[in-house]
């Protein structure tokens, strides 16, 4: 049916071109979802007294306010699905607290959870606490610092659900959207099949950037210690998938790291912890934060290998004719 409709449309175009007539646009029907969004997105508003529109025409023309735009003006920093903004806040919090005595709670209070509720660093830390500011309502809240001689276990007990509710949530202003909302970390931050494409793009981009860079990266080429948790066949598949002959570089990027300012340092792209290249060669070393999406070093390679395996099976099952037909179908949709 779609093919017949396309042919009718093409005949209409050819007929119009032959007769040099104007082509009538096809009607577009909004879906139910689009109609619902339009209904609740726009709000009627009255005409301005200084409007250039004649009085007799005002009753025939209705003006509307775009509630989405209005909300974005009042809450500039509220972006639930902006991963880049989330990572920027995490990075700023890590840099801000890198040299102070603070023991993050893995579940409730850490740079990731703070950033997911809209908090970012504010001014400088005192001897007893670290202040943070909401990027949206500009409210201020503080996190206590670990004092010399304090027991770490007792300190981390304080950084728990109580501080999450009283400080991280409770210190937002009543009308602040971050008070009732939080970035969906399972969907936006942690690794999943839905966001795996972002990891593929990141690794491809980093390979191009590092390989084409003028400064040589002092990483031992094909050092198996970087990717000791992978078999030789697995690292070969992954390197071939990313079109990179340097196994060490692929292994480094699979761990979530990227080249830092100093040639012998790398930095995680998700928790922003730093490590030297020498430390990475120790098989027991894990430089990521406990809440980091790359803390389980085997997770990302496993997901990519499963994806590669599915592609290989699909290619081997299809004959040449079937592959050509599938390619033709894809091209038709484009």
From Swiss-Prot:
Record key words, sorted: Membrane, mRNA transport, Nucleus, Transport
A Pfam family annotated for this UniProt entry: zf-C3HC
Membrane topology: Peripheral membrane protein
Entry's Gene Ontology BP terms: maintenance of RNA location; mRNA transport
Listed InterPro entries: NuBaID_N
Source organism, top-level taxon: Eukaryota
GO cellular component, one term: nuclear membrane
Main location as per UniProt: nucleus
MF annotations from Gene Ontology: zinc ion binding
Location in the cell: Nucleus membrane
Assembly and interaction partners: Interacts with MLP1 and MLP2.
Other observations noted: Present with 2205 molecules/cell in log phase SD medium.
Record's function text: Involved in the nuclear retention of improperly spliced pre-mRNAs.
Name of the featured protein: Pre-mRNA leakage protein 39
Annotated gene: PML39
């Amino acid at each position: 049916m779609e093919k017949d409709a396309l042919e009718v449309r093409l005949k209409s175009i050819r007929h119009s071109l032959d007769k040099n007539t104007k082509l009538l646009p096809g009607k577009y029907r909004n879906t139910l979802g689009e109609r619902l969004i339009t209904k609740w997105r726009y709000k009627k508003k009255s005409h301005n007294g200084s409007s250039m529109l004649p009085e007799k025409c005002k009753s025939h023309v209705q003006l509307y306010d775009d509630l989405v735009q209005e909300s974005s003006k009042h809450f500039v920093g509220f972006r639930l699905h902006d991963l880049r903004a989330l990572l920027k806040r995490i990075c700023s919090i890590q840099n801000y607290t890198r040299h102070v005595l603070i023991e993050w709670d893995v579940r409730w209070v850490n740079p990731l959870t703070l950033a997911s509720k809209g908090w970012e660093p504010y001014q400088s830390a005192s001897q007893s606490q670290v202040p943070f500011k909401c990027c949206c309502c500009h409210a201020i809240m503080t996190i206590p610092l670990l004092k010399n001689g304090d027991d770490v276990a007792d300190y981390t007990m304080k950084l728990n659900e109580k501080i999450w509710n009283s400080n991280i949530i409770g210190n937002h202003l009543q009308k602040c959207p971050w008070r009732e909302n939080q970035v969906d970390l399972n969907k936006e931050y942690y690794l999943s099949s839905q966001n795996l494409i972002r990891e593929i793009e990141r690794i491809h981009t980093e390979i191009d950037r590092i390989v084409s860079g003028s400064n040589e990266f002092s990483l031992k080429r094909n050092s198996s210690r970087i990717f000791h948790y992978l078999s030789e066949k697995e690292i070969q598949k992954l390197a071939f998938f990313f079109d990179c002959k340097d196994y060490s570089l692929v292994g480094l990027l699979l761990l979530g790291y990227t080249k830092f300012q100093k040639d012998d340092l790398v930095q995680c792209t998700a928790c922003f912890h730093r490590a030297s290249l020498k430390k990475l060669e120790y098989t027991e070393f894990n430089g990521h934060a406990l809440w980091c999406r790359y803390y389980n070093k085997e997770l990302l390679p496993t997901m990519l290998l499963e994806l590669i395996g599915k592609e290989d099976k699909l290619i081997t099952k299809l004959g040449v004719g079937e592959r050509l037909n599938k390619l033709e179908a894809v091209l038709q949709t484009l």
